Amino acid sequence: SVSGLVGGDAQRMWDYAAEQETLCGPYLQEVIATALCVAESNACMHRIVAAPTAGACGVLPAVLVPLYRRGAVDEEAIVRALYVAAGIGAVVGYRASISGASGGCQAEVGTAAAMAAGALVDLRGGGPEQIGHAVAMALKNLMGLVCDPVAGLVEVPCVKRNVIGAVNAVSAADMALAGIESRVPVDQVIDCMGDVGRRLPVELRETALGGLAATPFGQSVKAKREERRSQEQEL
């Protein structure tokens, strides 16, 4: 990656799973590895699909690709699930925000998790109400998550937050399919997320002025990056 802080973790996850049984089981292991892989690809400036943003690009493919690879679903089902996910993202974008700069990471990874949760419910034959409950639970689980990229790069903690978003989506989908409901209606959850995002201080909305970006580690990475830029300009 640009800073050298990101890269190789997806392969480490695959290697770990090949050597021993993971705590989370085969499917979730693939979800984790795929989320890392796609998010690392973004950090390394490779081609990705923003879903709904580049910073959250690993969540949706992380839950869908393993199912397709296993032959659990066909291409037509995946396409339908992607339409469901897109519809969810459009609603969240209209009622709240999908931008970390305006709503924090809850608006990016949180929305991606909601999209993925809804897509999974659709793949398993769930109806609109269950999709709504999955979306609500996925959003509630990440409510208030701040956007605090170290040195302003979409690397730390962004890559690993894609993993949390994907695993969150799986748990929300399974709960909804089990008949577990969100007590707060999904539209109200979305509106609440938008309100929370607007209340976040500017330091916690992609400015790299607060949160993990403001830690001694974060500041050291920023200083090294600025020093490197200065040296490049002198050349």
Regions found by a protein language model. Name each.
Residues S1-V49:
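Extended amphipathic alpha-helical scaffolds
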Residues G25-N42, A77-A96, N141-P149:
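Acidic-glycine-rich active-site phosphate/pyrophosphate-binding loop
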Residues M45-I48, I98-G104, L153-V156:
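Active-site-adjacent structural elements in folded domains
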Residues M45-V63, C105-A112:
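Conserved phosphate/anionic-ligand binding catalytic regions in large, soluble enzymes, centered on
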Residues A56-L64, A112-G118, A166-A172:
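Well-ordered alpha-helical segments within folded domains of soluble proteins
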Residues P61-A72, A117-G125:
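Alpha-helical support elements that line or immediately flank enzyme active sites
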Residues G93, I98-Q106, A112-A113, A117, ...:
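N-terminal glycine-/lysine-enriched basic segments
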Residues G118-L235:
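Functionally critical mobile loop/hinge segments
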